[in-house]
Amino acid sequence: TMPLFDNENRILQIETEKEKIFKLMENPLISQPFTEDFAKRFSWSTNAIEGNTLSLEETIAVLDYDEVRSNHTYSEYADAKNAYYAIQKMLLPFAKAIIDEEWIKKANGYIRHMQGEYRDTTVYVGNLSEAVYYPPEPQDVPELMRNWIRGADIEAVTVQEIFEKIAANHVRFERIHPFSDGNGRTGRMIINQQLIN
């Protein structure tokens, strides 16, 4: 069977073209529309993964014109706006940043439009009748996160090595599940900051 993605060729393409891309991004006529497009698409996709039913077009309409349509909940529109705001505050302009406890809590706070604090309750992944994973107890989260943060600064030589280390780091973050909500969206913000770094 054919793989869904031809990762080897895509990684090779990124490896060979990254310097050219970095050079092009120095031109504001290229970087500004790219950055805006990234922010909107990431806002849409990070929420779609969580089950938000807004289309990309509907997400852009609410972000650009505050336009809402029927068949969607208020929270779906709020999630789109919150994610976009988080991206604007935390990831743009694309610049290196230290991913520490403050950064992570701030990102989660923007995503949820509230104070980003580690959870103080037991949570589960899945639904009430079929939990697929029980994250660590809340009292263990601060220490687990301190340990996780020590490995958040990804050092690698090749693009493939960067991707592999970030993916493994992301799995560890999601297994800790440090927040009562927004862990997936926060984790994807971290992935993007790690790629920027």
Predicted regions and their residues:
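FIC/Doc superfamily catalytic core
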Residues: 1-197
